[in-house]
A protein has these predicted regions:
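Acidic (Asp/Glu)-rich catalytic clusters
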Residues: 243-244, 264-266, 373-375
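Divalent metal-binding segments
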Residues: 3, 11-20, 25-247, 253, ...
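Non-cysteine beta-strand/loop elements that form the S-adenosyl-L-methionine
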Residues: 75, 270-286, 378-388
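Short, conserved secondary-structure transition motifs
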Residues: 258-262, 360-369
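Short aromatic-centered micro-motifs
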Residues: 36, 276, 511
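Conserved, mostly hydrophobic/aromatic
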Residues: 157, 215, 280, 326, ...
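His/Asp/Glu-enriched, well-ordered alpha-helical/loop segment
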Residues: 202, 314-324, 331-357, 362, ...
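Short, Lys/Arg- and Gly-enriched loop/turn segments at beta-strand edges
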Residues: 492-499
Length: 522
C-alpha cells in the first residue's frame, strides 16, 4: 500500500510517530531514512533499522522529507480572495478587467460591494487603467474599489467618492478616482467594513488550507489597521486563532500600527510593524527612492521619518516585541536604518540585534545600506517572485527606474554573502502563494550576479523564516527541532534542480506543522 493509502488526516493521532522508509533531508544525519516526531518535536533522526519504538508508523515509500516552508509575508484575506473571490491578476487589458468585474458583480446583491485587486497595467498593450466611471458601470452601480496588484494604488467608483467625502481630505486623493497613499488605504478599508469578520475568516481559511497543500507550515500575517475599518482588531485576532486550529498552518501576526506595541501585544501579535509602511511601491511610484524615477519627476512617498522609526523601536523594546518596517526604496531603507542609529545609544547594539528587527521587501540597496543592516542585525524579509515578475532589463522596474537600477534591485546574493539573514515570502496576493516558485526565482534572478545557490535559497524559504520569527528551534530536521516538515513526490535524496526551467516543481504529499498533519493529498 502507498503512503497516501495508509495515512490520512484522521489517522495521525498517536503521540509518538515514526516516519520511515524515505529520504530525510537532515543536517545531522545525511543518510537518514526515518524520523520520529513526538508531540510537536522531532526526537530522533536516523536509519530505518536503528529506529526506536513508536506508537504509530508511517511508511514513506521512498519519498523525500524536507523542512516545511514558511511564508514570511502574507495578507491572508487578500490571498484567500484571490482563490475564492474576485481577482484581477493575469488579465491582458483594462477591458478584460472590466469584463471580469461585470461578471462577478452580476452575482452580488444590489446593495452589495465590489472590492478586488490584482490588475497590472504594465502587462497590457495599452497601460491606461480603467476610468472610475467604467469601473462603477461594470460593477452595476455598486460601491466599488479595485486595487492595483501592488496594493498601493487603485481606482474608486464615483459613488464611493460621493458617499465618503472624507476621502477627499486625505493624502493621495484625486478626483479622477485613482487613489494612492492614505486615500487608497482608507477607501479600501471603508468598503472592507461591509464584510463581517466571520466572512473574512472563511476567506482566510481558504488561503491557509491552500498554503498547507503547498508544504507551508507557518505564515507571517501582515495586518494593516485603518481607522476606517473598526473590525480590523477582531479580524486580526481571528486570523491568529485560525493558526491555532489543528488542521491549519500556524499564523504569526504582525500589527502594522506605529508605536502601538502594547496594543499589538494585547491583540496576540508576534511583533509590531510588518507592513508598517516607510514607503509605497515601485509600481505605484510611491516607493521612496534617493534618485528620481525614470518615468516620473518624483522621489516617491516617505511615510516614516527616522524619528518615527526611532519612536516605534523604543516603544517595541519597552514592551518586548520585535519591529518590522515595509521599505522598498533605498530612501525608505535609509530612513529605517537612520532610526536604528538614533536608538542605538539608548538601547545598545546587543539589544537591537537580539530583537531581530526586520525590513520587509528591502528591494533597493547599495553596499553601504547592506553594511548597516549587518551592523544592526536586521533580517531581510524578501520576495524573490517580485524580481521574476517585474525585474530585469526590460521589466516594470526598468521602466520605473532605468536599466541599471532595475538590475541592481533585490540583491539577494550580496545580502546573503555578508551575513544579512534572509526570509522568503510571497506578499500574497501581490504574488501567489508559491514557495517553490520563490526558490526558483532566487536561483534564476534576472541579474545572474544576484542569484543564490539552491541550498541558500531553500534555507531562506524554510529555516530563514523561523529565524526571522526568533525561533531557532525550527526549520531543520534534527532532534529537539519542532516537527514542521513536508513529504514530497520525489524519491531522490536531494533538492530538485530548479535552476533548470524544465524541472517541474515538486508536489506536496503531506505537510506536518507542529506535529500536526495539516495536509494530505489522500
Amino acid at each position: 500500500m502507498s503512503l497516501l493509502q495508509k495515512t490520512g488526516p484522521a489517522t495521525l493521532r498517536a503521540e509518538k510517530v515514526l516516519w520511515r522508509g524515505g529520504r530525510v533531508l537532515s543536517p545531522t544525519s545525511p543518510a537518514a531514512t526515518a524520523l520520529i516526531a513526538e508531540g510537536d518535536r522531532i526526537v530522533w533522526v536516523g536509519l530505518d533499522d536503528e529506529a526506536p519504538a513508536a506508537d504509530q508508523t508511517v511508511d514513506l515509500d521512498g519519498a523525500l522529507v524536507t523542512p516545511a516552508f514558511v511564508d514570511s509575508h502574507v495578507h491572508l484575506l487578500g490571498a484567500g480572495a484571490s482563490l475564492i473571490g474576485l481577482h484581477l491578476a493575469d488579465l491582458p487589458s483594462a477591458a478584460a478587467v472590466l469584463a471580469r468585474v461585470a461578471s462577478f458583480a452580476a452575482s452580488v446583491p444590489a446593495d452589495g460591494i465590489v472590492l478586488a485587486g490584482g490588475w497590472d497595467e504594465t502587462a497590457w498593450a495599452d497601460p491606461t487603467p480603467p476610468a472610475a466611471e467604467e469601473v462603477e458601470r461594470a460593477a452595476g452601480g455598486r460601491l466599488v474599489y479595485l486595487s492595483r496588484t501592488c496594493g498601493h494604488t487603485g481606482v474608486a467608483g464615483p459613488r464611493l467618492l460621493a458617499e465618503h467625502p472624507e476621502l477627499a481630505a486625505l493624502d493621495g486623493f484625486d478626483a479622477s478616482g485613482v487613489l494612492t497613499r492614505a486615500a487608497h488605504r482608507a477607501a479600501r478599508a471603508v468598503l472592507q467594513t461591509a464584510v463581517p469578520v466571520a466572512q473574512r475568516l472563511i476567506t482566510a481559511r481558504a488561503a491557509l488550507a491552500h498554503a498547507a497543500s503547498l508544504g507551508i507550515a507557518a505564515v507571517a500575517e501582515m495586518a494593516i489597521p485603518n481607522a476606517a475599518d473598526p473590525l480590523t482588531e477582531a479580524e486580526f485576532q481571528g486570523l491568529i486563532a485560525l493558526g491555532a486550529e489543528p488542521d491549519l498552518p500556524a499564523v504569526y501576526g504582525w500589527w502594522g500600527e506605529l508605536a502601538a506595541a502594547e496594543k499589538a501585544r494585547d491583540l496576540g501579535a508576534h511583533g509590531c510593524g510588518g507592513d508598517l509602511s516607510a514607503d509605497g511601491s515601485l509600481g505605484a511610484r510611491t516607493a521612496f527612492v534617493r534618485e528620481p524615477y525614470r518615468d516620473a519627476d518624483t522621489l516617491g512617498a516617505q511615510y516614516l521619518t527616522a524619528d518615527d522609526v526611532a519612536a516605534h523601536l523604543l516603544d517595541c523594546h519597552r514592551i518586548g516585541l520585535p519591529a518590522a518596517f515595509h521599505a522598498i526604496g533605498d530612501g525608505a531603507v535609509q530612513s529605517v536604518l537612520d532610526g536604528l542609529d538614533l536608538v542605538e545609544p539608548a538601547l545598545g547594539i546587543d539589544a537591537i540585534r537580539h530583537a531581530r528587527h526586520r525590513i520587509e521587501h528591502a528591494e533597493l540597496l547599495d553596499s553601504a545600506l547592506i553594511a548597516r543592516m549587518v551592523h544592526h542585525g536586521v533580517h531581510a524579509s524578501v520576495q524573490p517572485a517580485f524580481d521574476a515578475a517585474w525585474g530585469g532589463a526590460d521589466g516594470m522596474y526598468a521602466a520605473r527606474l532605468g536599466r541599471e537600477r532595475a538590475l541592481a534591485a533585490n540583491p539577494l546574493s550580496k545580502l546573503a554573502g555578508v551575513g544579512v539573514p534572509l526570509a522568503f515570502g510571497s506578499d500574497a496576493p501581490v504574488t501567489a502563494l508559491d514557495p517553490w516558485g520563490g526558490v526558483r526565482a532566487a536561483l534564476l534572478h534576472r541579474n545572474p550576479v544576484s542569484r543564490l545557490p539552491a541550498a541558500a535559497a531553500f534555507s531562506a524559504a524554510t529555516r530563514g523564516g523561523w529565524r526571522a520569527l526568533g525561533r531557532d528551534d525550527a526549520g531543520a530536521l534534527a532532534p529537539s527541532q519542532r516537527a514542521n516538515f513536508t513529504v514530497w513526490d520525489l524519491t531522490t535524496g536531494a533538492l530538485p534542480d530548479l535552476s533548470d526551467p524544465r524541472t517541474p516543481d515538486p508536489k506536496c504529499s503531506m505537510t506536518v506543522a507542529g506535529g500536526r498533519l495539516v495536509y494530505s493529498r489522500a
